[in-house]
Amino acid sequence: MNNIDFDAIDLTKEAPVTEPERQYYYIAKARKYVSEKAQEIGRNLTFCVTTFGYQMNARDSEKLVGVLELIGYKEEPDEEKADFVIYNTCTVRENANLRVYGRLGQLGAKKKKNPHMFIGLCGCMMQEPTVVEKIKKSYRFVDLIFGTHNIYKFAELIVTRFESERMVIDIWKDTDKIVEDLPSERKFSFKSGVNIMFGCNNFCSYCIVPYVRGRERSRNPKDIIREIEGLVADGVVEVMLLGQNVNSYGKNLEEPMTFAQLLQEIEKIEGLERIRFMTSHPKDLSDELIDVMAHSKKICKHLHLPVQSGSSRILQKMNRHYTKEHYLEVVRKIREAVPDISLTTDIIVGFPGETEEDFQDTLDIVRQVRYDSAFTFIYSKRTGTPAAAMEDQVPDDVVKDRFDRLLKEVQQISAEVCSVHQGTTQDVLVESVNDHDPSLVTGRMSNNLLVHFPGDESMIGKIVTVYLKEAKGFYYMGELCK
């Protein structure tokens, strides 16, 4: 990718049919159009990408930014001033859609004042036909609409918009194609997300993701290794391997490979210091993976293992394919193999039919596992999922009471678990200057906890040894070891 001379691409010829060569052609063509528009208005064109949702969306946004910068746009953090505004949407919760509609209405007024403005919508929300129909009818000023399966065609879609001067819509219901060797602008120079697979086959009854992200597709391991080697050569010391369920990696490859085997290959990459991954589904967390984690020198001592509920009855209704007992056995195995592992989780309160007894099972699993932290959610009915049609929706006041009780329990345990590291020394990857005190820097330990300590900008991206002086509940104050 870095060796492509886009100015040398002959635009008088037809676009190639193979990927990613076809997108290189359209990047060159888009550069021409953007340059002409900038000359016409007498200034650089600007863009603002807003990301809704989780880490895979953030990784997709880095690709959007990479293309926009390569074709000549300059980043503008204030969308009010940008010439090209893109919303990379998330649709896990229904209110996320409402947020996008609200902000779109405001953008429409801005576009009337800026005739050069483009508005693009992509991501999971665009995979819903009802959403696209609503945008076509009520938000006709939108220029680009595309989904999750063809984000690699971004440059081609921009060219189509320049040439047609009409709304461009390109939504694929599904795909088996993976095109990754394209521009990307990383948020951090020292760490990066790496997609290892796309889609999900689990169909949890409350979740829309399999319907908008498609079925599981694993990347070729050689391509993953090549990408990480390139990142390390560019200064990256930590990678986060991304997938809806990384534990099921490799099942659809011509030569099947397990996630544990992939981790062993990544471990061999010289210069790579740390490996993280998410998300892991408890039903697929194998003994092989636990063994690899136990013997690794690079895999971080942190595992995000979403439990969702402690009730086996509710887990069955959720279509999670494990019981409370199975989950606790997985936790026992991982703790036995990696005693200093940090465990975090996701928990949903108020799933349809949840009784007080079910909720007590959830509190019990929180007390038994003693998570370092937990993301707690009130169940949100999601149109298009089986759970949305279930009877016995739990009254709001009951859900709110349970949520408050769970949060109190989680926070108390988290503070106790966090404090056990006080007085120890830990290796820390320095990530930033502290937001509240510029005399401090903020770093992340292997177990994913943050520590703030005296330092300066020159330390960012380096792994240093820090003494943890004081636990502050969910983070530490420390000092650099001499």
Features from the language model and the residues they span:
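Proteins enriched for Cys/Gly/acidic motifs involved in redox and nucleic-acid/cofactor modification
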Residues: 1-249, 288, 303, 325-336, ...
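Radical SAM enzyme [4Fe-4S]-AdoMet core and its adjacent flexible, acidic
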Residues: 54, 250-271, 318-321, 381-412
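Conserved SAM/AdoMet-binding glycine-rich loop
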Residues: 119-121, 128-130, 233-356, 367
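Glycine-centered loop/turn positions within well-structured domains
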Residues: 152, 202, 247, 283, ...
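Short flexible coil/turn linkers enriched for glycine and charged/polar residues
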Residues: 187-190, 200-202, 299, 309, ...
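Conserved, mostly hydrophobic/aromatic
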Residues: 204, 224, 241, 277, ...
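Contiguous mid-protein beta-loop-alpha structural module that forms a pocket-lining wall or clamp
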Residues: 354, 361, 370-371
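Terminal RNA-binding accessory module
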Residues: 389-482
